[in-house]
From Swiss-Prot:
One of its GO terms (biological process) is galactose metabolic process. The active site is at D174 (proton acceptor). It holds the Pfam family GalKase_gal_bdg. InterPro entries: Galactokinase (IPR000705), Galactokinase_bac (IPR022963), Galactokinase_CS (IPR019741), GalKase_N (IPR019539), GHMP_kinase_C_dom (IPR013750), GHMP_kinase_C_sf (IPR036554), GHMP_kinase_N_dom (IPR006204), GHMP_knse_ATP-bd_CS (IPR006203). Its EC number is 2.7.1.6. Keywords: ATP-binding, Carbohydrate metabolism, Cytoplasm, Galactose metabolism, Kinase, Magnesium, Metal-binding, Nucleotide-binding, Transferase. It comes from the Bacteria. The record marks R28 as: Transition state stabilizer. It catalyses: alpha-D-galactose + ATP = alpha-D-galactose 1-phosphate + ADP + H(+). It comes from Erwinia tasmaniensis (strain DSM 17950 / CFBP 7177 / CIP 109463 / NCPPB 4357 / Et1/99). GO terms for molecular function: ATP binding; galactokinase activity; magnesium ion binding. It is an enzyme of class 2 (transferase). Its main location: cytoplasm. This is Galactokinase.
Length: 382
């Protein structure tokens, strides 16, 4: 049964009437551009065909009533006329409440809503299940109450909810691609200006995501350390962010920098350049050049930014050996585990999957999870 049918049926059973709208917002994978977002740089994500779906309808009062199908149909009810606080037990409720809290500050004409939520974005895999939920909830209120908000506003609202209400620090990429993605396209996002450009993806290219299932444990503390090192690098060059540092200037003064900071700066500067080139290369279907750029990105994350782990490097090598020049592969996400992303002709998917099944578990002791995705549309009615 589809998510759409499931949420609609549970809505009718639980609330005693049929939903008027069903909304979806997708998860995402970042094809290239890692740890560039908080340095005001460039990223190249695409939305994927895993999403959060919400069956919904207006209420005549000021209550927001929500059922989370994936959490044993837990319910949450709160009022728009009272201060919106965190839920004492249910973390999923905080994402809903946070989105609604900041929507109220952006648009006065909100009213009550009934919602039933379900999703199939894998949680904990770095595919942005939380951003998908935030954008879906924002889109519900925007649709039902015709709020004068853009898709970018919905994305920024979701980021604010996650940062300030839930308390998880995140950049803007995840919400922007979930809100603004286009079918069969990636999106080049300038994280400083929030300007976007759709990058058409050749129809015969598959987006393959493979979860290493390596348990990440350093990601929080190491993320903060990398961020501080990047800020130190920007200060050294007298800039507010590494976005404004030129590679030539870095090359001239690299020897003056702390060696570790220099490695971090080199990654960000070269990754920005790779991301801009990758957008052009992808649009013209040059998989051979894309493979080189993705390989350089992974090597930079491994050697200069030092955020990969042996299981990730092993999986990348297995896929790379199987693909040759017929596609690219790299780690994606914050690092220290998580997923790798590969772009390849659809006819190569089966042989890559077979190679991974043959070698990865035998060499790492871990069993991968394999997702074959399509670049999908951002949030909207379904």
């Amino acid at each position: 049964m589809s998510l759409q049918t499931t949420t609609q049926q549970i809505f009718s059973c639980a609330f005693g009437y049929a939903p008027t709208h069903t909304v979806q917002a997708p998860g995402r994978v970042n094809l290239i551009g890692e740890h560039t977002d908080y340095n005001d740089g460039f990223v190249l994500p695409c939305a994927i065909d895993y999403q959060t779906v919400i069956a919904c309808a207006k209420r005549s009062d000021r209550q927001v009533r929500t059922i989370a199908v994936d959490y044993d149909n837990q319910q949450d009810i709160f009022s728009l006329d009272e201060p919106i606080e965190r839920h004492p037990q249910q973390l999923w409720s905080d994402y809903v409440r946070g989105v609604v809290k900041y929507l109220q500050q952006r648009a006065a004409d909100l009213g009550g809503v009934d919602m039933v939520i379900s999703g199939n974005v894998p949680q904990g895999a770095g595919l942005s299940s939380s951003a998908s939920l935030e954008v879906a909830v924002g889109s519900v209120f925007r649709q039902l109450y015709q709020l004068p908000l853009s898709s970018a506003d919905i994305a920024l609202n979701g980021q604010q909810a996650e940062n300030q209400f839930v308390g998880c620090h995140c950049g803007i990429m995840d919400q922007m691609i979930s809100a603004l993605g286009e079918k069969n396209s990636a999106m080049l996002l300038d994280c400083r200006t929030l300007d976007t450009r759709a990058v058409p993806m050749p129809s015969d290219i598959a987006v393959v995501i493979i979860n290493t299932n390596f348990k990440r444990n350093l990601v929080g503390s190491e993320y903060n350390t990398r961020r501080q090192q990047c800020e130190a690098g920007a200060r050294f060059f007298g800039q507010s962010s590494l976005r404004d540092v030129e590679l030539a200037e870095f090359a001239e003064r690299e020897h003056e920098l702390d060696p570790l900071v220099a490695k971090r700066v080199r990654h960000v500067l070269t990754e920005n350049a790779r991301t801009l080139e990758a957008a052009n290369v992808l649009a013209r279907g040059d998989l051979a050049r894309l493979a080189v750029l993705m390989a350089e990105s992974h090597a930079s994350m491994r050697d200069d930014f030092e955020i990969t782990v042996p299981a990730v490097d092993m999986l990348v090598d297995i896929v790379k050996t199987s693909l040759g020049e017929r596609g690219g592969v790299r780690m994606t996400g914050g690092g220290f585990g998580g997923c790798v992303v590969a772009l390849m002709p659809r006819e190569r998917v089966a042989s890559v999957k077979a190679a991974v099944e043959q070698h990865y578990q035998a060499e790492s002791g871990l069993k991968e999870t394999f997702y074959v995705c399509t670049a999908s549309a951002g949030a909207g009615l379904c």
